């Protein structure tokens, strides 16, 4: 698999590409299945439908890897939290976790209830071409904790940051519980057939440097090193969004560092390119224009070179109204410009 070889800096015929949120609303085929499911969570919990939308970008765009269709919040959902998706507001938990009593009420083994995810993986792996990788994923403990404590997305993260400074013992206890759940969940994904895993820390930038390492990165690395010890052949990708100023102190045993679009790729290469394969990082809105897409690809390829050490991706997720034709063009362009 070209994607897996690239994760380990092995020789590849071209730079592989996949896109975060590549299975999504910009694809009419996705919307068809989504409408049939009725709502987002039903789609996530239906292995046949979730497998179908996981496979769509590989069939339509010819990306080098499929990423499991699911949601990061299935972990807190199966810990017993009441989750709903509000139109225009996104995910909402009706009862946030803010006290020791709340923490004690969380079910400790959510991975046992996530059988629909493992079933999806098995279906996809059977149908996916042998040369295409399947990426499993989880939210990072910090990002999951922010949703669980805030109760929804947040602009200030005031509730969780208040706990960091007023009750760090509670926060670490919550982080440990989530971390153990993520480890078990990713082990089950690997055992079900994924070829690589990515851990998404969407809200990493909410923390000042010292607290980022204490409450986010240390836990991500703990998961990565736990997995690498058991499954050295499975690449681990870490994606902390918005931490360009912290790159000097990034450490840990993992394979690929995901670069968001706000971090200059040349800076990431200078700071981390010798230690980790880099993944990223075109600004997603460039895909509204073929000219802007071409310029974005050329800039990144100029820095990273048509050689090992890079996986092409966007620096954030696909937007719902991006033209499918431009996404196809991006994949073709990356393959053509980087052919060895």
Curated annotation (Swiss-Prot):
Single GO MF annotation: uroporphyrinogen decarboxylase activity
EC primary class: lyase
GO cellular component, one term: cytosol
InterPro entries referenced in this protein's UniProt entry, alphabetically: UROD/MetE-like_sf, Uroporphyrinogen_deCO2ase_HemE, Uroporphyrinogen_deCOase
Sites where the protein binds substrate: 21-25, 71, 147, 202, 316
Keyword Ligase: no
Site (Transition state stabilizer): 71
Subcellular location(s) per record: Cytoplasm
GO biological process per UniProt: protoporphyrinogen IX biosynthetic process from glutamate
Record-annotated disulphide pairs: none
Subunit-structure text: Homodimer.
Official protein name in the record: Uroporphyrinogen decarboxylase
Organism: Nitratiruptor sp. (strain SB155-2)
